[in-house]
């Protein structure tokens, strides 16, 4: 193995790093697709190796505290400024941004069936369908919950989102996310997060794909504090994977789409923007297998708050009040004694958008299907349907393993407003509230 050195600088291997992933969350990573492509001991040398351009991508202000300062240095074949002419407005389809007041639907608990896969060729940019928006994209607060329906890979098209980071939650079909930092493969049961400003394209792996997409306008997702839980369990940092460098040296013209200020814009590039040969820093895309989440729960009695299932959180300026919490309900043992084990009836200051990746959700055994969604907005009551209540109220309280299920929730401090598309969709269940109508009056003052 050859080692290059310079006066006063630490030597570094010139052997190319093996393709794949690097483990860890929020690490200061470094990776090179060609040996020696990373400058040693400095970020912006007079002449970068291989004739590359040094470019910094900042995910936080320069003066952010060290613990929350995010940036990466990219060493690329051409700088990002090299695009052709001005950006022009592009058709955004069904993609909407907050604030979105296009529909004044009466407040209600809502649930949708899974949307059908497209019958025509439809790329990622054509297949995003916004369900709800919350907050304000212009103040960098809030989120949008989308579905994506894809039947064709992006060819000679690339995209980045200046409005927020994107969390992909596949439900059917795998995706290949070709980013300027490297390649991420993501399948149902996994998530992938693409930070604000990172260029990428979406390719299909095994046929048409359907899934959920969270657009986070606020602070980047991070691991929640564990508090008294301690140093282990929930989502462990070692299970997050960031791609190693991979690049394309292609002079084929491509379209570059940018979401900025709630609108979609497009310009032309004379080359592929996936041309980063090496990079280092802590601002990068990543993936996570939700099945590595280590849940904690009640081992005596009662049902704890769903916050114990938080995978990632986007904090707000108010401690303990999230811009977004990403929560999952995975396989787990239920052992609590003398306890109603499903989630209890609830009214919440937070607004909850839920999806089901596979299996059956224990509080809604009927009607909530994989690929479907529900919305329980702030201070609107929700909880188990009659079937779940009757079963859990009379079940033998032996240890039970909840298997073959994976549901999730995007929970935000902001009210979620429903788009016209979501409010008028044929998948909207008109009879959702009927699932609670059968709950009987059980009160008897003579029987404590």
From Swiss-Prot:
Database matches in Pfam families: HgmA_C, HgmA_N
GO molecular function: homogentisate 1,2-dioxygenase activity; iron ion binding
GO biological process: L-phenylalanine catabolic process; tyrosine catabolic process
The keyword Iron is annotated on this UniProt entry: yes
Residues annotated to bind Fe cation: 346, 352, 382
First-level EC class: oxidoreductase
Gene3D superfamilies: Jelly Rolls
Cofactor: Fe cation
Classification via CDD domains: cupin_HGO_N
Function: Involved in the catabolism of homogentisate (2,5-dihydroxyphenylacetate or 2,5-OH-PhAc), a central intermediate in the degradation of phenylalanine and tyrosine. Catalyzes the oxidative ring cleavage of the aromatic ring of homogentisate to yield maleylacetoacetate.
Similarity field: Belongs to the homogentisate dioxygenase family.
Pathway, per record: Amino-acid degradation; L-phenylalanine degradation; acetoacetate and fumarate from L-phenylalanine: step 4/6
Reactions mediated catalytically: homogentisate + O2 = 4-maleylacetoacetate + H(+)
Amino-acid positions noted as binding homogentisate in the UniProt annotation, renumbered to this chain: 361, 382
GO (cellular component) term, any one: cytoplasm
Entry-linked InterPro entries: HgmA_C, HgmA_N, Homogentis_dOase, Homogentis_dOase_bac, RmlC-like_jellyroll, RmlC_Cupin_sf
Keyword line: Dioxygenase, Iron, Metal-binding, Oxidoreductase, Phenylalanine catabolism, Tyrosine catabolism
Protein's UniProt name: Homogentisate 1,2-dioxygenase
NCBIfam families: hmgA
Subunit composition and interactions: Hexamer; dimer of trimers.
Organism of provenance: Rhodopseudomonas palustris (strain BisB18)
EC number from the UniProt entry: 1.13.11.5
Top-level taxon: Bacteria
Stored SUPFAM superfamilies: RmlC-like cupins
Residue numbers annotated as active site: 303
């Amino acid at each position: 193995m050859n080692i290059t050195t310079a006066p006063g600088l630490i030597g570094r291997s010139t052997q190319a790093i093996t393709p794949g992933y690097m483990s860890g969350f929020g690490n200061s990573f470094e990776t090179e697709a060609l040996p020696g492509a990373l400058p040693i001991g400095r970020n912006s040398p007079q002449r970068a190796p291989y004739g590359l351009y040094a470019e910094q991508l900042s995910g936080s202000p320069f003066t952010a505290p060290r613990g929350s300062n995010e940036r990466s240095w990219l060493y690329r074949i051409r700088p990002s400024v090299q695009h052709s002419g001005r950006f022009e407005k592009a058709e955004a389809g069904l993609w909407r941004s907050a604030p979105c007041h296009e529909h004044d639907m009466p407040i209600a608990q809502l649930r949708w069936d899974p949307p059908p896969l497209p019958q025509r060729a439809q790329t990622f940019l054509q297949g995003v369908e916004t369900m709800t928006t919350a907050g304000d994209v212009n103040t960098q607060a809030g989120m949008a919950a989308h579905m994506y329906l894809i039947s064709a890979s992006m060819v000679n098209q690339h995209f980045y989102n200046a409005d927020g980071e994107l969390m992909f939650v596949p439900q059917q079909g795998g995706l290949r996310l070709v980013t300027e930092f490297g390649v991420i493969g993501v399948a149902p049961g996994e998530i992938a997060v693409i930070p604000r400003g990172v260029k990428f394209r979406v390719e299909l792996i095994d046929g048409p794909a359907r899934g959920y997409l969270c657009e986070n306008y606020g602070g980047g997702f991070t691991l929640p504090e564990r508090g008294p839980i301690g140093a282990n369990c929930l989502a462990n940092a070692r299970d997050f994977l960031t791609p190693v460098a991979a690049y394309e040296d292609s002079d084929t013209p491509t379209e570059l789409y940018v979401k900025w200020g709630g609108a979609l814009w497009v310009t032309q590039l004379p080359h592929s923007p996936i041309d980063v040969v090496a990079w280092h820093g802590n601002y990068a895309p990543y993936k996570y297998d939700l099945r590595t989440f280590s849940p904690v729960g009640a081992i005596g009695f009662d049902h704890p708050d769903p916050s114990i299932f938080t995978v990632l959180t986007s904090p707000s300026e108010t401690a303990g009040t999230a811009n977004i919490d990403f929560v999952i309900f995975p396989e787990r043992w239920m052992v609590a004694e003398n306890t109603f084990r499903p989630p209890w009836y609830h009214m919440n200051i937070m607004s909850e958008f839920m999806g089901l990746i596979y299996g059956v959700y224990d509080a809604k055994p009927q009607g909530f299907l994989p690929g479907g969604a529900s919305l329980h907005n702030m201070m609107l009551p929700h909880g188990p349907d009659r079937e779940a209540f009757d079963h859990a109220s009379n079940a033998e309280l032996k240890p039970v393993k909840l298997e073959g299920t994976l549901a999730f929730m995007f929970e935000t401090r902001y009210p979620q407003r429903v788009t016209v598309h979501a409010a008028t969709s044929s998948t909207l269940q008109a009879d959702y509230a009927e699932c609670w109508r059968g709950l009987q009056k059980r009160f008897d003052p003579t029987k404590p």
